[in-house]
Amino acid sequence: MASGLDVLARLAAGAPIDAPTLVLVAHPDDETIGLGARLNRFTDLLLVTATNGAPLNMADAERAGFASATAYAQARKGEQARALDALAARPLEICFEVVDQACVDHVGDLADRLVDVLADRALVITHPYEGGHPDHDACAMAVQLACAQLGAEAPLRLEFAAYHQADGAMVSQAFWPDPSAPEVRPAMSTDDLARKTEAFAAYASQADVMSHFSPDREAYRLAPIYDFTRPPPPGACLFDGFGWALKSGDWRTRAAASAG
């Protein structure tokens, strides 16, 4: 298997990546925001989406014009398919069908399921632990736990940038700085940008969300080892300000209980 630095260099340059790879995202749209310019460079890609994209709270669904969580989830799945077509990406796909915003209570199960599908993968790429979204953090934890279970057989862990809080504001498509894990940014071609712009537009139900991101920005790095019993590296959690019942302190307690 190529070294982590070599993989990062290939991601930055847009070179083909032949190593069997698993990308774990929390929701339909995360793959496009975080890795959309590079998904078509993987020749052996398994895309795993942890949630169905539909919270039990109907606020998001109703705001997008849907009368049920089921209809909203189906619409988001269709949007993801259209986005992948726009990106010229042809991964194998699995959805674990966890309820959106509920991954914290399924960390252990997610890790166990990942062990089964990581056995033949050389690389795994997911969200960082940065307090941007509770499902993102749960994905980061599940991957770290799964790789710990696999030991010497574990794939190389990488991350794509999502969003976090710094100085009281949301910072998107950039990592919280970690000197031990410097980030790289891709050289995006005109075709890359055109495909990703079309993929952004495929997520019609998520137009408000997508407006916080730019198609021309991505960043990747080797994943550090996180201590999930402590607050994420930025300290403050962005999702504490979303008005949701789940707060970051509760997240750590429930994630630890779920992980066993």
Would you name each region that the model predicts?
Residues 18, 128, 140, 163-168, ...:
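Bulky hydrophobic/aromatic packing residues
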Residues 151-177:
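Short, flexible loop segments at boundaries between secondary-structure elements
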Residues 167-229:
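A conserved mid-domain beta-alpha-beta active-site/ligand-binding segment of alpha/beta enzyme cores
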